[in-house]
Amino acid sequence: MVPAVAGAFLLGFSSIFTGLNMVVTIHKFKPKGMGWFKMPLSLWGIYATAVIQVLATPVLGLTLLLLFVERIVGIGIFDPALGGDPVLFQHFFWFYSHPAVYIMILPAMAVMSELITVFAKKHIFGYSFIAYSSIGLALLSFLVWGHHMFVSGQSTLANMVFSALTFSVAIPSAIKVFNWIATLYKADIHLDSPMIWALMFILLFAIGGLTGIFLGTLNVDVHLHDTYFVVSHFHYVMMGSALIAFFGALHYWWPKMTGKMYAEKPAVIMALMVFFSFNLTFLPQFVMGARGMPRRYFDYDPRFELMHQLSSLGAFIMGVTLFCILMNLLISLKTGKKAPANPWGGTTLEWQTSSPPPLYNFPVGQPIPLPELYEYDNLVKDEVNGGWHYKKDDAATEA
């Protein structure tokens, strides 16, 4: 165990340094003319994530250091046999591990803010609210760790406070979701594969968030704690949101990274297959958990057999589909058409250069073209060669 603790301690430094790198890069390397509220919303999400990495990871490092000292020296810190308190370890662990959830979900939300506006061809609704909600989520993530410990023996007052704070997290999350939906309202929606992933994200994230309300409610959590309901909720938030956003981002930026277009129709079909198989896997687990099926049991009551079979079937279908998605992307490296500079009609900086970008992204020593962020009126689709371009040469200002 000691080598594992030492390894995790060292890995924590990589997270801290990465966060510092992101914060400094955003502060110091924005192009001339790009103020804070001219940044892409993806950068706001990355910035909020980096703040969590810098502030939360040291707590994990100190916890591992205390655990290391306890093991080596024999001082009672967490081990009750030595006079320690295991609940203290839970507090330290969850103080890091709940913000760590937002390290995964905030970049996913940032990706959604990009995909939805690009494929709706409409200015993002409530830019400043989405930006501030990212910072709000980062700050609130440090205040709700105790909802993981409702049944661990902490005081009733602490349970009540953490329950109330847990519900407050819904505010910045809902701000994002409703602004995304408002962006889609009466928009010119293009159902390309990245947009399919984005729409899936909104629905799955909504289910994950709404089921979290039950777990944040004290008396309900006593029944649902450590059941399959928690397993399903976690996967709707982490896999149904973070992983879905990852695949949406992968399909969105793949042409820019590789210079190749993948097969679009199979990509759409496989995205829909993931949606079907994901829900087949995890919806039955909500029912099982509500009916008392505990997690981490290798066996189960016969009345849960059908739902376990459905869940297993969905998992197998999803696994095969994810493999096919990967193959579709890899095949495009050899057989895919050459990607245009701006295949989706994006207005952020990466779409103002070639696919893939040259070294240093833009020619060294020349002004960086700074387009009007999330403005699509001057963009037209090239029906012959594919991709999008501006109507006028001066649509993007130079900075």
PLM ranges: what are they?
Residues M1-A399:
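Membrane-embedded and interfacial regions of multi-pass energy-transducing membrane proteins
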